[in-house]
């Protein structure tokens, strides 16, 4: 498992965790121009250090136990964050006629829904085991920042250029690999065992592979300043949405201030 939050892991550049992955995890393609890899590695490091990723709430949650109400709020908001993402990612496919990009998009979505149980089913099982059932979720009103996050991601993936959409997805998948590791730490601190935390542990490596898929898709297209500007717009618009989301969750749950 590629844990990005251990002291050992922080002693080396973050992109090394993406260059050297566990068997069965999507690997990066070899890039002929070393400057392209250096650029994408640098963007990965900028994503990893962004406040939306190194958020005070997430860092506090790693070592702060929540009461049942706080826990319900946190994971109900996560449900409304995650639930439609595979559909939005699939919508990116109509923007391109490049089979490499199409393949990488399909591989990411296939990880989520291509086998039984699907990852959304695993997440629903996790929620049920901590006392959050479908009836609760159907009646739950998420924060406005959570609605804005969902709408913003849908817009980025389905209504912007392919370069900008891939920038957002690179930020999404890279951020997610770190976020799920922090949440897994918090759940472990809460006293939950490996079996209950399976969804989160699974995604630590899965999201690294998903980030690598986006690396493979975008690498041929970030040679120019104009393409990089579009790509970076997507990266930082996505991270801004996530930062505001965690700010809202922090206020709701009441830790990490």
Curated annotation (Swiss-Prot):
Q: Where does Fe cation 2 bind?
A: 112, 173, 207, 210
Positions bound to Fe cation 1: 112, 119, 203
Query: Keywords assigned by UniProt?
Result: Amino-acid biosynthesis, Antibiotic biosynthesis, Iron, Metal-binding, Oxidoreductase, Plasmid
Question: InterPro entries in the record, alphabetically?
Answer: Alkyne_AA_Synthase, Haem_Oase-like_multi-hlx, PqqC-like
Domain of life of the organism in this record? Bacteria
Q: What happens when the gene is disrupted?
A: Cells lacking this gene no longer produce detectable amounts of L-propargylglycine and L-beta-ethynylserine, that are terminal alkyne-containing amino acids produced by wild-type S.cattleya.
Q: Report which reactions are catalysed by this protein.
A: 4-chloro-L-lysine + AH2 + O2 = L-2-amino-4-chloropent-4-enoate + formaldehyde + A + NH4(+) + H2O
- Please provide, alphabetically and separated by semicolons, the GO molecular function terms listed in this UniProt record: 4-chloro-allylglycine synthase activity; metal ion binding
First-tier enzyme category under EC: oxidoreductase
Q: Which SUPFAM superfamilies match?
A: Heme oxygenase-like
Task: Name the pathway it acts in.
Answer: Amino-acid metabolism; Antibiotic biosynthesis
Q: Which Gene3D superfamilies match?
A: Heme oxygenase-like (1.20.910.10)
Q: Which PANTHER family match?
A: 4-AMINOBENZOATE SYNTHASE (PTHR40279:SF3), PQQC-LIKE PROTEIN (PTHR40279)
Q: What function does the entry list?
A: Involved in the biosynthesis of terminal alkyne-containing amino acids such as L-propargylglycine (Pra) and L-beta-ethynylserine, that are produced as antibiotics by S.cattleya. Catalyzes an oxidative C-C bond cleavage in 4-chloro-L-lysine to form 4-chloro-allyl-L-glycine (also named L-2-amino-4-chloropent-4-enoate), with release of formaldehyde and ammonia. Is also able to react with L-lysine directly to produce allylglycine in vitro.
Q: Which NCBIfam families match?
A: ChlAlygly_Syn_BesC
This protein's name:
4-chloro-allylglycine synthase
Give the source species.
Streptantibioticus cattleyicolor (strain ATCC 35852 / DSM 46488 / JCM 4925 / NBRC 14057 / NRRL 8057)
Q: What phylogenetic lineage does the species belong to? A: Bacteria, Bacillati, Actinomycetota, Actinomycetes, Kitasatosporales
């Amino acid at each position: 498992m590629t844990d990005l939050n251990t002291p050992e892991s922080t002693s080396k550049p973050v992109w090394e965790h993406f260059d050297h992955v566990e068997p069965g995890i999507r690997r990066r393609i070899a890039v002929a121009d070393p400057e392209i890899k250096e650029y994408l590695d640098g963007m990965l490091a900028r994503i990893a250090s962004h406040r939306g990723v190194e958020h005070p709430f997430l860092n506090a949650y790693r070592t702060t136990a929540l009461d049942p109400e706080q826990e319900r709020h946190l994971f109900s908001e996560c449900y409304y964050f995650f639930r439609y993402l595979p559909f939005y990612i699939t919508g990116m496919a109509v923007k391109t006629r490049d089979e490499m990009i199409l393949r990488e998009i399909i591989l990411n979505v296939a990880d989520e829904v291509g086998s039984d149980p699907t990852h959304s089913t695993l997440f629903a099982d996790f929620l049920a085991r901590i006392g959050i059932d479908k009836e609760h979720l159907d009646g739950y009103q998420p924060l406005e920042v959570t609605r804005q996050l969902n709408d913003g991601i849908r817009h980025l993936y389905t209504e912007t250029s392919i370069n900008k959409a891939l920038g957002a997805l690179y930020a999404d998948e890279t951020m997610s690999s770190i976020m799920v590791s922090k949440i897994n730490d918090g759940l472990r601190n809460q006293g939950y065992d490996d079996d209950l935390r399976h969804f989160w542990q699974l995604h630590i490596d899965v999201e690294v592979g998903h980030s690598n898929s986006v690396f493979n898709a975008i690498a041929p297209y970030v040679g120019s300043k104009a393409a990089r500007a579009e790509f970076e717009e997507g990266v930082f618009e996505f991270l801004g949405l996530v930062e505001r989301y965690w700010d809202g969750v922090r206020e709701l749950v009441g830790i990490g201030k």
